[in-house]
């Protein structure tokens, strides 16, 4: 399987996209809001993607909840991560987070989608790019909520992706628009932001990790997503992480410091990423495919969903889905009223 995850433009594949998906470097595809009209159309698009590729691709989406939820009509409107602990006592918050993880994963698997890039493990709500996507500013509470969410995902048959290593929450800047700089010491980052990653790796709660397009300037002048120090020395060697490392989208401005699209891809791969996201720029994606040295992404196949297929309507007829949908819809409405 190839190490590149691409996107497509619309509701169905065009001929160019069918050819691109056959490229040996392509190993995954991520879906966005622009790819979604309704559940029936989405189901057909996923079928087209499966049929177009010579190998089984990992199909992904960002279906976190709150403001980052690509598919809405016909699916449960998931609450923002911050809402669980903000509006509930600890036990109930954990219970709701677990049901949200299960429901989100179950709905995506019903569409034959392998993974949602979740959960967000960043701490605090001040960063423009993170905000309500963070479970809490307190590491212990964030760990409790995130662990419950992961347990729910796994019970549905979906693997987890913790993001954004080693922590994006302490910078205000948005890495979609610029390259943020975190001026803290390595010890400060270890004691706070990295603690949740370390704990979850030790307890084997993370199947994949996505590093941040953030420069931690006291440690390395390269973004973590393109830093061998962060990905090989810290994540692989010191923390012992054996799962998949995804780059964040290489079209983000936070990655531009690494050079052209082909250079960003090669540097991220050399730094230790297993799969590279190249989205929202077809020319850049083609440049990556034309220039990247072929590397087989051995770890990626571990992320395929592993539950028997059921339709979305069959899932929505189940008692557990009905109860979870009711609780989470109520929480989402309460959170919107508060906002």
From Swiss-Prot:
Plays a role in peptidoglycan recycling by cleaving the terminal beta-1,4-linked N-acetylglucosamine (GlcNAc) from peptide-linked peptidoglycan fragments, giving rise to free GlcNAc, anhydro-N-acetylmuramic acid and anhydro-N-acetylmuramic acid-linked peptides. Belongs to the glycosyl hydrolase 3 family. NagZ subfamily. GO terms for cellular component: cytoplasm. Gene3D superfamilies: Glycoside hydrolase, family 3, N-terminal domain (3.20.20.300). Residues 171-185 have a biased composition (Basic and acidic residues). The keyword Cell wall biogenesis/degradation applies. One of its GO terms (biological process) is peptidoglycan turnover. The record marks 174 as: Important for catalytic activity. The gene is nagZ. It catalyses: Hydrolysis of terminal non-reducing N-acetyl-D-hexosamine residues in N-acetyl-beta-D-hexosaminides. The keyword Cell division applies. Keywords: Cell cycle, Cell division, Cell shape, Cell wall biogenesis/degradation, Cytoplasm, Glycosidase, Hydrolase, Peptidoglycan synthesis. This is Beta-hexosaminidase. The active site is at residues 176, 248. InterPro entries: Beta_hexosaminidase_bac, Glyco_hydro_3_AS, Glyco_hydro_3_N, Glyco_hydro_3_N_sf, Glycoside_hydrolase_SF, NagZ_Beta-hexosaminidase. Pathway: Cell wall biogenesis; peptidoglycan recycling. It holds the Pfam family Glyco_hydro_3. It is found in: Cytoplasm. Residues 164-185 are annotated as: Disordered. Substrate binds at residues 62, 70, 133, 163-164. PROSITE patterns: GLYCOSYL_HYDROL_F3. Its EC number is 3.2.1.52. GO terms for molecular function: beta-N-acetylhexosaminidase activity. It is an enzyme of class 3 (hydrolase).
């Amino acid at each position: 399987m190839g190490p590149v995850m691409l996107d497509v433009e619309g509701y169905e594949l065009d001929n160019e996209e069918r050819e691109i998906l056959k490229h040996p470097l392509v190993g995954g595809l991520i879906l966005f809001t622009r790819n979604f009209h309704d559940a029936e159309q989405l189901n057909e698009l996923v079928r087209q993607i499966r049929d177009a590729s010579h190998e089984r691709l990992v199909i992904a989406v960002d279906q976190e909840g709150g403001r980052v939820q690509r598919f809405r009509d016909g699916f449960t409107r998931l609450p923002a991560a911050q809402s669980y602990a903000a509006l509930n006592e600890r036990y109930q918050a954990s219970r709701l987070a677990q049901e949200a993880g299960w429901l989100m994963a179950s709905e995506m698997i019903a569409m034959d989608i392998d993974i949602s890039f979740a959960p967000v493990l960043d701490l605090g709500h001040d960063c423009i790019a993170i905000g309500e996507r963070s479970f809490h500013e307190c590491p212990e509470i964030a760990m409790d909520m995130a662990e419950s969410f992961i347990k729910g995902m796994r019970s549905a048959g979906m693997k987890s992706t913790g993001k954004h290593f080693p922590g994006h929450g302490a910078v205000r800047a948005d890495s979609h628009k610029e390259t943020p700089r975190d001026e803290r010491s390595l010890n400060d980052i270890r004691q706070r932001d990295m603690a949740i990653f370390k704990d979850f790796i030790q307890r084997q709660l993370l199947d994949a990790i996505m590093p941040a397009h953030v420069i931690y300037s006291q440690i390395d002048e390269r973004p973590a997503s393109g830093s061998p120090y962060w990905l090989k020395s810290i994540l692989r060697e010191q923390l012992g992480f054996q799962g998949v490392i995804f780059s964040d989208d290489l079209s983000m401005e936070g990655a531009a410091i690494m050079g052209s699209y082909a250079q960003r891809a090669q540097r991220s791969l050399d730094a230790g990423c297993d799969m590279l996201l190249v989205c929202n720029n077809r020319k850049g994606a083609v440049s990556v495919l034309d220039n990247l040295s072929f590397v087989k992404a051995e770890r990626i196949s571990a992320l395929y969903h592993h539950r028997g297929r059921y339709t979305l309507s069959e899932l929505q007829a189940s008692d557990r889905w009905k109860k979870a949908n009711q609780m989470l819809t109520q929480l989402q409405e309460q959170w919107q009223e508060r906002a």
